[in-house]
Amino acid sequence: MPQADAGLLIHHSLPFVARALAPEEKIVQVSKDSIDLGIVVTDEKAALGFYRDQLGLEWEGELPVPGGRMYRLKCGTTVIKLLKLNRTPEAKPAAGGIVGGLGYRYFTISVPDIRGLMAQLEAKGIKPTVSITEARPGVTIAMVTDPDGNTVEFLLNTSAK
């Protein structure tokens, strides 16, 4: 059962034993090494200011989509799709950070220099919601929040080298 600890979920044990599926057993066959992420935003200018101008994600373009407009940014092979709907939804992200509700609560960007990154972000006025923390041996994280209250985690994994 997951437990909250300093705003992080820690899994002590899983109630099942997983086995690797044979290739023919896999239902989802992936065609690239990452997933893309769609984020519905209330203010596309503020969201672009955060993700493109402050975090430095690469601009890919914008296009009309049914019900709104999509702004596409690259993060490695991942595409972050900011979606501004014609009608802004009333629902907001649950308060309380990653332990504040169910569902997608944050996404992670792996970085080579978490201290340098956080210093640059703080110089731009972005305050961490979780300061630089060793989550487990060899794994250091920090988190920030976008203008709509969505959490972005930065992760440095030195144990994988």
Briefly describe each language-model feature range.
Residues 23-35, 58-108, 118-145, 157-161:
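Vicinal oxygen chelate
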Residues 47-52, 121, 149:
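Conserved active-site tyrosine of GNAT-family acetyltransferases
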Residues 4-6, 17-22:
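Acidic, Ala/Val/Gly-enriched low-complexity intrinsically disordered segments
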Residues 40, 108-110:
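Short hydrophobic/aromatic beta-strand micro-patches
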Residues 11-12:
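Intrinsic-disorder-associated, low-complexity terminal segments enriched in Asp/Asn/His/Tyr and depleted
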